[in-house]
Swiss-Prot record:
UniProt cofactor(s): Zn(2+)
Protein name as catalogued: Histidinol dehydrogenase
GO cellular component terms, semicolon-separated: cytoplasm
Taxonomic superkingdom: Archaea
Gene transcribed to yield this protein: hisD
Taxonomic lineage of the native organism: Archaea, Methanobacteriati, Methanobacteriota, Thermococci, Thermococcales
GO MF annotations, alphabetized: histidinol dehydrogenase activity; NAD binding; zinc ion binding
Role: Catalyzes the sequential NAD-dependent oxidations of L-histidinol to L-histidinaldehyde and then to L-histidine.
């Protein structure tokens, strides 16, 4: 049975048997049999376990992320022409779900998704996280508390996606965010249409464009830092320096020596990496040549880990070449643009011939009648 069929069968079983099936899969995959929703006492216990210094670091980081994302907010567009009103208004989603993966705890995932959701005006946020020894990571619970998220569930894998999408054991969400393993990804893919999803996150990627001015160790450790995410992670060095190429020629790193920085940019556009660092004498001059990248980090002191944690820019990025057609997570991913119009009688009468003729061309008679019947 391939992964698509495997996930489909589990989702079908959960749809049919509901909470009973979720309990069985939670026991099977996570070894957990207790209540799913995290209690107020567990929130309190988690906060008590966090060192004060870590609390301060988390608060400072959240402020930086919030500051960056508040600048993204768009104003509604409204204008009047010929006595008619036209516009585009933005409405936040009411309820979303955030999947925070297990394995290594990733509290930064909750920060990077939860903050823009709150900035956008999302009122209800649900978090799911696979339990470890029957508990959710205390840092995740502390961040949830700071973001005023009260619904956190000890749920992982396919069953967590199903619970959020179908509204089993909780209210259904409108859209699911957050990375996961191949089973979570496939579950998200299959529930798309029932709910929205952010993206299908793949292995981490980094490409570095560097010339002879780049510090060799800076470049090397930036490349290696992304390979640390897992064996499927990818790293490319695109450089005009043979010396740097030789120094960074390590296992897992694809090294490409180019004749010019322009050629490096061309290669980067073909790769469309999740993260692109440009460490050259004049990195800003190359930005206009980059068309495909999830994020661009310039200069010696903007490594990917800085962006992952404390710069405030979002680290939820397209992978697997998807940067050719989509971009970084923003507040707009949590909002819906809605067009609005109120046309005056005078403008309608003067312009309706456009619609009447187009309806005739398309052969849809009742569209035409809807326009003609108005006098």
């Amino acid at each position: 049975m391939d992964i698509e069929e495997y996930v489909r069968e589990i989702l079908k079983d959960i749809r049919e048997r509901g909470l009973e099936a979720i309990r069985e899969y939670s026991k099977k995959f996570d070894g957990y049999e207790g209540p799913f929703e995290v209690s107020k006492e567990e929130f309190k216990e988690a906060e008590e376990r966090i060192p004060e210094r870590d609390k301060e670091i988390i608060k400072r980081t959240l402020k930086r992320i919030e500051k960056y994302h508040r600048k993204q907010l768009k104003q509604d567009i409204l204008y009047i022409e010929n006595g008619s009103l036209y516009g585009l208004i933005y409405k936040p989603l009411k309820r979303i779900g955030i999947y925070v993966p297990g394995g290594k705890p990733l509290p930064s995932t909750l920060m990077m998704v939860g903050v823009p959701a709150r900035v956008a005006g999302v009122k209800e946020i649900v978090v799911t996280n696979p339990p470890k020894d029957g508990k959710v990571n205390p840092y995740i619970l502390y961040i949830a508390k700071l973001l005023k998220i009260e619904e956190v569930y000890k749920l992982g894998g396919i069953q967590a996606i199903a619970a959020m999408a179908y509204g089993i054991g909780m209210k259904k969400v409108q859209k699911i965010f957050g990375p996961g393993n191949k089973f979570v990804n496939e579950a998200k893919r299959q529930v798309f249409g029932i709910v929205g999803i952010d993206s299908l996150a793949g292995p981490s990627e980094i490409a570095v464009i560097a010339d002879e001015s780049a510090d060799k160790d800076f470049v090397l450790y930036d490349l290696l830092s992304q390979l640390e995410h897992g064996k499927d992670s990818k790293a490319w060095l695109l450089t005009t320096s043979k010396e740097l190429a030789d120094y960074c020629n390590r296992e897992g790193i694809t090294v490409i020596v180019c004749s010019s920085l322009e050629e490096c940019c061309k290669k980067a556009n073909e790769i469309a990496p999740e993260h692109l660092e440009i460490i050259t004498r004049e990195p800003l001059k190359l930005v206009d040549l980059i068309e495909n990248a999830g994020a661009i980090y310039l200069g010696l002191y903007t490594p990917v880990p800085a962006a992952d944690y404390f710069l405030g820019v979002n680290h939820v990025l397209p992978t697997g070449g998807a940067a050719k057609f989509m971009g970084v997570l923003t507040v707009w991913d949590f909002m819906k643009p809605i067009s609005i119009a109120m046309v005056s009688r005078e403008e309608f009468i003067s312009e309706r011939e456009l619609g009447i003729r187009l309806a005739e061309i398309e052969g849809i008679e009742l569209h035409k009648k809807s326009l003609e019947v108005r006098k």
